[in-house]
């Protein structure tokens, strides 16, 4: 499976974000891969 790019949904695939990204639950929204801070 290819990794999930930035701003794309990672629901049910929390460990699949591309390098440097992490799955984050946005307020009142869905989970997306975002850059780690």
From Swiss-Prot:
Keyword Secreted set for record: yes
Cellular component, GO annotation: extracellular region
Gene3D superfamilies: 6.20.10.10
Subcellular location, record wording: Secreted
Disulfide bonds: 3-18, 10-23, 17-33
Keyword Disulfide bond: yes
GO-annotated molecular function: ion channel regulator activity; toxin activity
Main location: secreted
UniProt keyword annotations, A-Z: Disulfide bond, Ion channel impairing toxin, Knottin, Neurotoxin, Proton-gated sodium channel impairing toxin, Secreted, Toxin
Superkingdom, taxonomy of origin: Eukaryota
Expression by tissue: Expressed by the venom gland.
Note: Is more stable than psalmotoxin-1 (AC P60514) when challenged with either high temperature or human serum. Negative results: does not show activity on Nav1.2/SCN2A, Kv10.1/KCNH1/EAG1 and Kv11.1/KCNH2/ERG1.
Domain statement: The presence of a 'disulfide through disulfide knot' structurally defines this protein as a knottin.
Family affiliation: Belongs to the psalmotoxin-1 family.
The protein's role, per its UniProt record: This toxin acts on different isoforms of acid-sensing ion channel ASIC1 in a similar manner to psalmotoxin-1 (AC P60514). On ASIC1a homotrimer, it provokes a pH-dependent inhibition (IC(50)=39.7 nM on human and IC(50)=1.3 nM on rat channels), whereas it potentiates ASIC1b homotrimer and ASIC1a-ASIC1b heterotrimer (EC(50)=178.1 nM on human ASIC1b, EC(50)=46.5 nM on rat ASIC1b and EC(50)=17.4 nM on rat ASIC1a-ASIC1b channels).
Protein name per UniProt: Pi-theraphotoxin-Hm3a
Species this chain originates from: Heteroscodra maculata
């Amino acid at each position: 499976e290819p990794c999930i790019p930035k701003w794309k949904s990672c629901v049910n695939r929390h460990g699949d974000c591309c390098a440097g990204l992490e799955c984050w639950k946005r307020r009142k929204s869905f989970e997306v891969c975002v850059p780690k801070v």
